[in-house]
Amino acid sequence: MTQLTVKALSEEIGTPVDRLLEQLADAGMKKSSSDQVSDEEKQKLLTHLKKEHGDTSGDAEPTRLTLQRKTRSTLSVNAGGGKSKDVQIEVRKKRTYVKRSAIEDEAKREAEEAAQREAEEAAKRAAEEAAKREAEEAAKREAEEKAKREAEEAAKREAEKSVDRDAEEKAKRDAEGKAKRDAEEKVKQEAARKEAEELKRRQEEEAKRKAEEESQRKLEEAREMAEKNKERWSAAEENKGDMEDTDYHVTTSQYAREAEDEADRKEEEARRRKKKTKSSAKASENDERGGPRVQRGGKGGRKGKLSKPKSMQHGFDKSAVVAKSDVVIGETIVVSELANKMSVKATEVIKIMMKMGAMATINQVIDQETAQLVAEEMGHKVVLRKENELEEAVLSDRDNMFEAVPRAPVVTIMGHVDHGKTSTLDYIRRTHVASGEAGGITQHIGAYHVETENGMITFLDTPGHAAFTAMRARGAQATDIVVLVVAADDGVMPQTVEAIQHAKAAGVPLIVAVNKIDKEEANPDNVKNELSQYNVMPEEWGGENMFVHISAKQGTNIDQLLETILLQAEVLELTAVKEGMASGVVVESRLDKGRGPVATVLVQSGTLRKGDIVLCGQEYGRVRAMRDEIGNEVNEAGPSIPVEILGLSGVPAAGDEATVVRDERKAREVANYRAGKFREVKLARQQKSKLENMFSNMAAGDVAELNIVLKADVQGSVEAIADSLTKLSTEEVKVNIVGSGVGGITETDAVLAEASNAIILGFNVRADASARRAIEAASIDLRYYSIIYQLIDEVKQAMSGMLAPEFKQEIIGLAEVRDVFKSPKLGAIAGCMVTEGLIKRNAPIRVLRDNVVIYEGELESLRRFKDDVAEVKNGYECGIGVKNYNDVRVGDQIEVFETIEIKRTID
């Protein structure tokens, strides 16, 4: 038997403990909050509550009733071959009836009873207080009258006792004094009494006012409760109405129920009348013809075909007005899905897109903008859906409510190639990074932080070669100050101008370091003049840019450059949140064979710690290890500190934002969503075809393609090389990067190259053993490079070999016809004198008459005297027979030429 305490039972049924104890007492059970309640006592309490609410049946009347109707009929259908079969048809109807009146009356009665009880209690309290006040006033009046009578009797007794005059006078004086004193005492008592009455009256008024306010508040609460119940009931009715609109099987409205029953009754009566008239007509027909008429067919005959009642036949009326609805469009959508959302055929959508100038198929993915234009063109209202709600929620769930503190500046070294950027940074770091790069040029973004006497500075060293434009732009976006290194002997070069444009686009201050001032041909003033043409004005000329003359080789003014950087940083007042979850930017990334994906992250805010979960573009992972630029293990990194992190799921793209998140599962979902979105957008862009490009696409079939599989050591090099190779494409030869990636060359790359007939280019990477075996077996061209110049030059040579050669005709000899002879075998033979060059046998010729070409063919016979010869030189006579041409005349000229093939190259 299950027993509960009174307190547990009150929590279970949602009733206050005091209220439940009162109900138990009313039911004849005296309990406390800690007593046990048995099942019999619960049943007894339930019976008491039902009787109290007027329910004596003991069983609750059901508030919802569901009725089901089934109607069966038989339909004869044609089964083919002159036969028919009977099909049983069952029509099911289901209706649900809800008893609302009991619920509404009960709730209304409870609200009225609560308000009535509150009002009665308030009136009862007010009556008790009034009776109490009257009793106190009666007691006070009785005490005053008694004191007055006692005073009068005392005075009378004193007067009667005085015998003589002195005694009388003395008694009189005493009586007067006593009366005077009594009067004074009485006045004092009266004043005290009045003051007490006034105080009591004020207290009673205050108590009365509080009782009235409490009663009014209770009434207001009861009224608000009734209004809320009324609103809740009305909302419930609206919800019920919505349910009726949604599901026509569930009808809770009494009027709708009655109307439906009335319609069913009328339909049934009409069917019965129709059936009765048919049966009577059939009976009369049988009476007239002498018996019933039965249609027979086949061997044993068959039943007559039953006609379906007209009321049961389906009728479809096509709407004349096209339904306009809200169309919800995601970032990408398939054409067929868009048509379904607009309730039109997919061919209509394709027609609209063709009118707008875009070709599409029924299963093609289109972007959000195109779908929006199509839907609005067809008159629908478009609702653009944001599919990155999870991404925004994950990125916004951060605890960065900390105070910002000053941070070190991030300085990017920019400039033209070989102007001394890395050498300047070398002198600052006291290292030799320049010697470590192949060819002495920087091909990666190097991130370093340097401790100086006045503070810490973080440097980003960018390449200066034209192929690394994306790297320089990425460096400018993550920086606070740009130091533009310009050689004093070279002046402003193309990459110098490009670096100025990147700095201005990023909106960061520019400090110009004029390098190589120790050379004899150095001309710093010329550098200032050239830079002024690009709105880079020195401070001494009234501009905003600081110029520092340095020598990276000798270390001249390097300290002044650092002071200038720190001064500019102090003006900028750079701050960042040091505590909390970290966020930064990926400066560089690569695939290490032993450690996996490695990303160089520049922390911009917060503190990145070992073990944090990092979301980085399409990749995610837990930080397994962190190393600084020297290679030492670190456990945390604050703002403006570059570190290498290990543990990501893949190699992120350089420039991606790295953010620390709380949940690894959500980070994986966001990364997968980003990857899927990237694929969808890429597919939508690739499949987009314009009508005006159709003919150019058809003509593109004659273009030769050079397929390349590119692998490099870091992501930045992959981007730079792929961009440079793509720009080499011409109208005749197209460079197609079929595959690119970071890390060593694997067997998968070899299979891809074999399938696409591509060459493999490795930049600072090598192929493993399995890849080398696959490459040798398939005879794939594999080349390794460490300098980007050599890679681009060799690709140019390969493209030049794919170009169609040019052909040039060169005249090698000229002969003048002096006489014409007839030969029975060869026809007309021209006797000629060679005037220029030499005449070769089987060479193509032209016959000129009055310097006009009248025939073009080839030599058939070349003789000197009676001997066949291979060639005849200038100044000799010969006989020439022209193949398939006999109209040779004296004075004609025979021009002999040959076609020379000229090899083309790509500039």
UniProtKB/Swiss-Prot annotation:
Residues 28-44, 101-248 have a biased composition (Basic and acidic residues). It comes from Vibrio vulnificus (strain YJ016). Disulfide bonds: none annotated. This is Translation initiation factor IF-2. The gene is infB. Belongs to the TRAFAC class translation factor GTPase superfamily. Classic translation factor GTPase family. IF-2 subfamily. GO terms for cellular component: cytosol. Residues 515-518 are annotated as: G4. Pfam families: EF-G_D2 (PF22042), GTP_EFTU (PF00009), GTP_EFTU_D2 (PF03144), IF-2 (PF11987), IF2_assoc (PF08364), IF2_N (PF04760). Residues 406-575 form the tr-type G domain. Residues 26-317 are annotated as: Disordered. Residues 440-444 are annotated as: G2. Residues 415-422 are annotated as: G1. GTP binds at residues 415-422, 461-465, 515-518. Residues 551-553 are annotated as: G5. PANTHER family: TR-TYPE G DOMAIN-CONTAINING PROTEIN, TRANSLATION INITIATION FACTOR IF-2-RELATED. It is found in: Cytoplasm. Residues 461-464 are annotated as: G3. Residues 299-308 have a biased composition (Basic residues).
